[in-house]
UniProtKB/Swiss-Prot annotation:
The keyword Cytoplasm applies. Gene3D superfamilies: 3.90.950.10. Its EC number is 3.6.1.9. This is dTTP/UTP pyrophosphatase. Pfam families: Maf (PF02545). The keyword Cytoplasm applies.
């Protein structure tokens, strides 16, 4: 597909990122990148999500010459510990137990490749309520946490876990919209609100 047909390619399989980007009425297609998402030893959360977003963007840009390629990656950090996606309900409950009653950071790396190269990382601080074992067990077994960094979806059932958010809520969902729009504007992407 050439750049005239598709100006922006979203390098993500995440339905949440697709939904967030679609809210902006920006025309795009999706082409997921399959990369190794294992953190490097001692890699900080900011460096980790920035690296993964860049790698995803470059893999997909090689398949779509001439297009802008947008990629993102999100992780939850509790101190230096990175909390990715739980493998099962038991691991989800263990993550929720660690997050209960505490403040953690959600980092999303956003990278643009192809016509414009730039990477940014956005941090949002999220505080969980003190959760009962029953709440954690119910939520962990609901199925919702299994494909979510940190084992929760703030935009879904998991919203009841949260006592407060400092920063971008869309960042916690997987794509910080304000920062992403600013990035696309800097790149010169034709956006719906710009005069033709």
């Amino acid at each position: 597909m050439n750049a005239d047909q598709t100006l922006l390619v979203l390098a993500s399989a995440s339905p949440r990122r697709r939904e967030l980007l679609a809210q902006l009425d920006i025309r795009f297609t999706v082409s997921a990148a399959d990369i190794d998402e294992t953190p490097h030893a001692g890699e900080a959360a900011e460096a980790y999500v920035g690296r993964l977003a860049r790698e995803k963007a470059h893999v997909v840009a090689s398949r779509h010459p001439g297009a802008w390629v947008l990629a993102a990656d999100t992780t939850v950090a509790l101190g230096a510990e990175l909390l990715g996606k739980p493998r099962d309900a038991e691991e989800a409950q263990a993550m929720l137990t660690r997050l209960s009653g505490r403040t953690h950071d959600v980092y999303t790396g956003v990278a643009l490749a192809g016509r414009h190269e730039e990477t940014l990382v956005v941090r949002t601080r999220v505080t969980f309520r003190a959760l009962s074992s029953g709440e954690m067990s119910w939520y962990a077994n609901s199925g919702e946490p299994l494909d979510k960094a940190g084992a929760y979806a703030i935009q879904g059932k998991g919203g009841f876990l949260v006592a407060g958010v400092e920063g971008s809520t869309s960042n916690v969902v997987g794509l910080p919209l304000g920062e992403t729009v600013a990035l696309l504007e800097r790149a010169g992407l034709p956006l719906p609100w710009r005069a033709s």
